[in-house]
Amino acid sequence: MDTKGILLVAVLTALLCLQSGDTLGASWHRPDKCCLGYQKRPLPQVLLSSWYPTSQLCSKPGVIFLTKRGRQVCADKSKDWVKKLMQQLPVTAR
């Protein structure tokens, strides 16, 4: 195999590894839970059990509230209603 062929195979292999996220760097830096959008209306505290912050690696910083039914709801941590709920509910370790 000539040099161009070897180079082409190496580049294609590297691209496949990066795309699949199988490399150590790609999977190690991937945050577990990020918010893609935020809950717009305030949530009643009676429906919630706890909360935890999103990873600092997420593009949208937020808070994830856990409901008593086991659902997760993203909220903007800069909103007053979110700050109030964060003070009233326990933090869940994630």
From Swiss-Prot:
Q: Supply the InterPro entries for this chain.
A: Chemokine_b/g/d, Chemokine_CC_CS, Chemokine_IL8-like_dom, Interleukin_8-like_sf
Cystine pairs annotated here are: 34-58, 35-74
Gene Ontology biological process terms from the UniProt entry: immune response
Per the record's keyword annotation, is Secreted included, yes or no?
yes
Compartments where located: Secreted
Cite the CDD domains for this sequence.
Chemokine_CC
Which positions carry the signal peptide feature in this UniProt record? 1-20
Q: Quote the Pfam families the UniProt record gives.
A: IL8
The family line of this record is: Belongs to the intercrine beta (chemokine CC) family.
Q: Its quaternary structure?
A: Monomer. Interacts with human chemokine receptor CXCR4.
As for what it does, the entry says: Blocks infection by several different human immunodeficiency virus type 1 (HIV-1) strains. This occurs because vMIP-II binds to a wide range of chemokine receptors. May form part of the response to host defenses contributing to virus-induced neoplasia and may have relevance to KSHV and HIV-I interactions.
Q: What's the protein here called?
A: Viral macrophage inflammatory protein 2
Organism equals Human herpesvirus 8 type P (isolate GK18) (HHV-8)
